[in-house]
Design a protein with these regions (language model features):
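Histidine/acidic-residue-rich, glycine-tolerant segments that coordinate divalent metal ions
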Residues: 60-61, 82, 89-100, 107, ...
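Acidic/His- and Gly-rich active-site-bordering loop/insert found
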Residues: 2-101, 110-126
Length: 192
């Protein structure tokens, strides 16, 4: 199955890059990301996932039900931009003065949507459920806590494990750095 997933990921690469660039051009700040959420919803359309939209934020959770009982895995991606101007000259540079995706959240969002595509094609091989959490307000707004306090995950199953990622310019393309437990900065306390 590993080779199938790798092949599928390669086939989704152009779609992932296109979504990332679309989000990059129209960055939104904080908890109110209507255009970003619309792009994500469009990207999830046609997939066999249950979509639960946050009412307190523009976040959402898409739930993929596996074919057999098993663990519930949450994959999380942040969606918000930063209040700074972009001066990169890129053809897909920010069109919003004073806002840009300088931290990679546009990539995180596109990769998470593509992961939903890829895994939904293999739902018959999955034991348990996969929850895809698209979170606004990571940059100082406490978006994850707001979504959790709202009960957005109660529509699915309590996650047995949570995974997130962050692009890192210090690593070469195609290289993944990982470790067990918390890493990088956090606005909340991690209990475990």
């Amino acid at each position: 199955m590993y080779e199938q997933l790798l092949t599928g990921a390669r086939e989704l690469q152009a779609q992932t890059v296109a979504m990332r660039r679309e989000i990059h051009q129209e960055p939104e700040l904080g908890l109110d990301l209507p255009q970003t959420r619309a792009t994500v919803l469009d990207g999830l359309s046609g997939l066999d996932v249950e979509v639960h939209q946050s009412q307190a934020t523009t976040g959402l959770v898409a739930i993929l039900r596996g074919a057999r009982p098993g663990p519930n895995i949450l994959l999380r991606g942040d969606m918000d931009a930063l209040p700074m101007s972009e001066d990169t000259g890129l053809p897909y540079a920010s069109q919003a003065p004073g806002r840009m995706h300088a931290c990679g959240h546009d990539a995180h969002t596109a990769m998470l949507a593509s992961a939903a595509h890829l895994l939904s094609e293999h739902a018959q091989d999955i034991s348990g459920n996969v929850l895809f959490m698209f979170q606004p307000g990571e940059e100082g707004y406490g978006g994850a806590k707001i979504m959790l306090d709202e009960g957005v995950l109660e529509a699915g199953e309590k996650p047995d494990a949570v995974f997130a990622l962050h692009v890192h310019p210090g690593l070469p393309s195609g290289v993944i750095g990982c470790r067990s437990g918390p890493i990088l900065a956090a606005a909340d306390t991690v209990h475990g």
